[in-house]
Amino acid sequence: MCRLRVLLLLLPLAFVSSSALPIHDVDSQQNTSGFLGLQRLLQSFSRLFLKNDLLRDLDNFFSSPMDFRDLPRNFHQEENQEHRMGNHTLSSHLQIDKVTDNQTGEVLISEKVEASIEPERNPEGDWKVPKVEAKEPPVPVQKVTDSLHPEPRQVAFWIMKMPRRRTQPDVQDGGRWLIEKRHRMQAIRDGLRGGAREDSLEDGVHIPQHAKLPVRKTHFLYILRPSQQL
């Protein structure tokens, strides 16, 4: 109620000052334009607050004073309120903080109040939120082509010959295969057979089958490039 009384005391002073102020010329009117704007602002406040229904709810809007000595050393509180005042909605946000320094014992107390007045909204008027129609996602349009005449495309690939890997070292001195026992046994058997077939091998040189090197195959690498539309 203290704030309301201060506001009511300012209203008569504004009316008296505006009526007692003479207006002589254009210069004086320009100098008093700011004061006239303040007078109109006070008049709009008087029309809003000097109503019986607003006066009844005005005391309930302002919270009762709080004794900060009873609060703990560190305190934080936020409170939101809404009050219907005639055709208007009065919203308030109250925030109280108390912080105590443990080293120096300093106490910092802050109280913050934010208030706003909103007029009654007409759901069928300008405040109506437009409805957002759900649209179907666009479907990608495929290029129409004749099935009998497909589009020509260019296909290319590269052929690379892979290097051969040597699986076994080359035979040196013609007798590396005699290292293992089975090779030696095979040589003895081949020697015995060679004496019995000496006549049949006069025209050629006998080469043991196990001494022949394996046949090496050639490998190729094919790299296909993606097709390109001509």
Swiss-Prot record:
Source organism (scientific name): Mus musculus
Taxonomy of the source species: Eukaryota, Metazoa, Chordata, Craniata, Vertebrata
Free-text note on domains in this protein's UniProt record: Contains a N-terminal domain similar to that of the N-terminal section of DKK3.
Domain of life: Eukaryota
Location of the protein in the cell: Secreted; Cytoplasmic vesicle, Secretory vesicle, Acrosome
Known glycosylation sites: 31, 87, 102
PTM summary: N-glycosylated during spermatogenesis. Not N-glycosylated in mature sperm.
GO biological process terms on file: canonical Wnt signaling pathway; negative regulation of testosterone biosynthetic process; penetration of zona pellucida; positive regulation of apoptotic process; positive regulation of fat cell differentiation
Known function: Involved in fertilization by facilitating sperm penetration of the zona pellucida. May promote spermatocyte apoptosis, thereby limiting sperm production. In adults, may reduce testosterone synthesis in Leydig cells. Is not essential either for development or fertility.
Mutant phenotype after disruption: Nullizygous embryos Dkkl1 mice develop into viable, fertile adults.
Keywords assigned by UniProt, alphabetized: Cytoplasmic vesicle, Glycoprotein, Secreted, Signal
Organ and tissue specificity: Testis-specific. Abundant in the seminiferous tubules where it is associated with developing spermatocytes. Expressed only in testis (at protein level). Not detectable on postnatal days 4 and 9 but after day 18 it gradually increased as the development of testes progressed. Expressed at high levels in testis and at weak levels in epididymis.
Signal peptide range: 1-20
Keyword Ribonucleoprotein attached: no
Quaternary state and interactors: Interacts with SLXL1; Co-localize in seminiferous tubules. Interacts with SLY.
Gene Ontology CC, one term: extracellular region
Protein name from the UniProt record: Dickkopf-like protein 1
